[in-house]
Amino acid sequence: MQGPWVLLLLGLRLQLSLGVIPAEEENPAFWNRQAAEALDAAKKLQPIQKVAKNLILFLGDGLGVPTVTATRILKGQKNGKLGPETPLAMDRFPYLALSKTYNVDRQVPDSAATATAYLCGVKANFQTIGLSAAARFNQCNTTRGNEVISVMNRAKQAGKSVGVVTTTRVQHASPAGTYAHTVNRNWYSDADMPASARQEGCQDIATQLISNMDIDVILGGGRKYMFPMGTPDPEYPADASQNGIRLDGKNLVQEWLAKHQGAWYVWNRTELMQASLDQSVTHLMGLFEPGDTKYEIHRDPTLDPSLMEMTEAALRLLSRNPRGFYLFVEGGRIDHGHHEGVAYQALTEAVMFDDAIERAGQLTSEEDTLTLVTADHSHVFSFGGYTLRGSSIFGLAPSKAQDSKAYTSILYGNGPGYVFNSGVRPDVNESESGSPDYQQQAAVPLSSETHGGEDVAVFARGPQAHLVHGVQEQSFVAHVMAFAACLEPYTACDLAPPACTTDAAHPVAASLPLLAGTLLLLGASAAP
């Protein structure tokens, strides 16, 4: 077709939508020029051969490569683009590797043992956290002596401030890998443990959160695991199912507050914003739900902070330490959306995850901050069907299947989306497939969709980011971070000192007036 734009009708049957593809893409010069610019940038790329003052690890739980691509399309289309051509924030990182995610005892992994790998540098057994593979799942007596130490813990010992941010409960498998040692990832509180394990001296994960190490910032969900059984929840006081569940009668939040003179505990967005601006706050714990935080599509923006806002609040506090910081940020509910077989939930979580990466990049400098983005594992999630460019990622394939019914581009290999009534697969239309709660069809019936076993990507930017290359064991991630900051066992790293930045010039400091303005607006809206 000729003209300034090539118009494509994207969709057949009743699923018409209009996509606009630039006519210049028909000209080879467009692609040659684009490639030449990318090649020129690659030739100019120089490794930053200095010590990393700061370390940030962004973990997209379940963010396999197919999910990254689908997220790119969704985020691009949300911004009025066709989709696949629009880079994510993580796409702009200059270095890339693949990570092998298997556990010592499983070919397809879980989030506990993978956390041990990328956070502690040692591969482990399925459903265990912070322990070598000599430990056995659910056997309390195999814990002692098999503990492995996270890079975050080593950063704290080196004098850095440290923080954990997640959209799951803070006691969940991925964040727990920064501080806990347990043979069962589900031992969130003592109420979740068998009496025999408690008698043998094993500790629940919530107890380890406040006792194993001094964590400066803790933001996520998980209130009920911190309070005695029957303690009403501040957000849902009339709902007994949201009450505290601890059997030992301990108030772990109060115990944590008592340890630090400048500690604050918050449970909503307004309190978080206030605490993050208060220079007297040295430690900050924010628990915004009894369990996991709400999905982004269900989040109340006046009450619940987004992952991007939690990340910014953490950076504001941690960046005050002149010796630097370590921050772990997890987009944890990407994984949950996939397990439920609801791609809309998973991908909108992933878009917010990328927004948090983008904001962190604005608030830090790649000259002194090593930032890695990776996943713990993938999912049996795929999209295909020869869909036309610009069509909704949640839409239908342009042709019907052999049973003369439509099918969605996104499908799951297994999960709760399996529906076969009297030997007949249900039909689907564009309106159904675009619904936020639509469960994509699956090939095998399971109550919960499973992880995938393929390699995942590792994106890197900052000092020593060039070490992220090739195909590596997942445990390599932790070693790159430890080496970059000259932490154990790489204290003799012989790297040049980190780049110097002044408080006045620091991007986080520059953002304070904007945040103060946000608080004023919040106060005004709350006024009678």
Swiss-Prot record:
It is an enzyme of class 3 (hydrolase). It catalyses: a phosphate monoester + H2O = an alcohol + phosphate. It holds the Pfam family Alk_phosphatase. A lipid is attached at D503 (GPI-anchor amidated aspartate). Residues 504-528 form a propeptide. The active site is at S111 (phosphoserine intermediate). Its cofactor is Mg(2+); Zn(2+); Ca(2+). It is found in: Cell membrane. Its EC number is 3.1.3.1. Keywords: Calcium, Cell membrane, Disulfide bond, Glycoprotein, GPI-anchor, Hydrolase, Lipoprotein, Magnesium, Membrane, Metal-binding, Signal, Zinc. Disulfide bonds join C140-C202, C486-C493. InterPro entries: Alkaline_phosphatase, Alkaline_phosphatase_AS, Alkaline_phosphatase_core_sf. Its main location: membrane. Binds 1 Mg(2+) ion. Binds 2 Zn(2+) ions. In most mammals there are four different isozymes: placental (ALPP), germ cell (ALPG), intestinal (ALPI) and tissue non-specific (liver/bone/kidney) (ALPL/TNAP). This is Intestinal-type alkaline phosphatase.
